[in-house]
Amino acid sequence: NNYQILKAENPILIGSIKVIPFLIDHSAFDSYCFFIEADGKKILYTGDFRNHGRKGKLTDKITGRLSKHIDAVIIEGTNINRIQEKINTEENIENEIIEKVKNKIGINLIMLGSQNIDRIVSIYKATSKMKKILVVDIYTANILATLSKYAKIPYPSSNFKNIKVIFTQKLCRKLELEGKKDNILKFSKFKITKEEIETNKDNIMMIVKNSMLEEIGNIKGIENGTFIYSMWEGYLEKSTALLQFLERHKLEFIKIHTSGHANNNFIMKFIKEINPKMIIPIHTNYPEKFEMFGKNVKVLNDNQEIEIV
């Protein structure tokens, strides 16, 4: 039980070490970077970050506040090998969804990570502008309802009447066996049935997961609809069931995605603006790409220690 709840910019003291969490832009909700002060040294650990999401201003704010004061930055480099002049923002994603499906006939299915809250907000905004119904499963509904206590997030409720919940048998059975029936019942007022989806399929945007495909496949009339894939393309290679589902139901396959991580251009800009004395790249398959910053880059192996002087 020895834990502390993080609050943005509230310092945490661990002996003589001070850690200040700063909210930062990332696809996961409530992401933080950490400013660490110890033995007179100042270290910034970025965590996973970007600036092209709905909270991009948070990342820009950090560079303004902490620049010129960093002895070392521990920085992620997931996309350091991706050099893009222009990167999709979440606002672009929202507009692209509208452009691709506004004149389509048939159901619209979209696959993404259920904890990619920025993306769900983009989908909700697009769905609302098209006056369509957004359908989510019980798992996603519970995540949204929980997080709505901490931020202005759309969730199945009387405040967001165009969000409905599909009660898939597989997940409902699992929750009942685990004694979590309340996680199902609290969304009863916002339930949408398979029959209602069939009747209104032209007006539906449904968030789906691989575990739902078998049940979704039993909905009448989903053939020739649209399937938007809003995830990292690398997952597709292992998604045999999904590829078979798409072929079986003759769904139009559309990719609309942007990464939860900063690209090469922004990583370079970020480092130049905070101007650290030392750069320690992590979370990357291409640490050598950081060598452009010269002698102050330290590429470390696992378990290797370094002294910041």
Predicted region positions:
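C-terminal regulatory/interaction regions
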Residues: K129, C172-V309
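His/Asp/Glu-rich metal-coordinating catalytic cores
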Residues: N1-D118, S122-S128, I133, Y150-P156
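Short acidic-hydrophobic, aromatic-tinged amphipathic segments that line or gate anion-handling sites
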Residues: N2-A8, V165-Q169, K298-L300
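A polyampholytic, Gly/Pro-enriched intrinsically disordered region
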Residues: P21-I24, K41, Y155-V165, N275-P281
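Active-site neighborhood of phospho(di)ester-bond hydrolases with catalytic His/Asp-centered motifs
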Residues: I24, L44-F49, V73-T78, N108-G113, ...
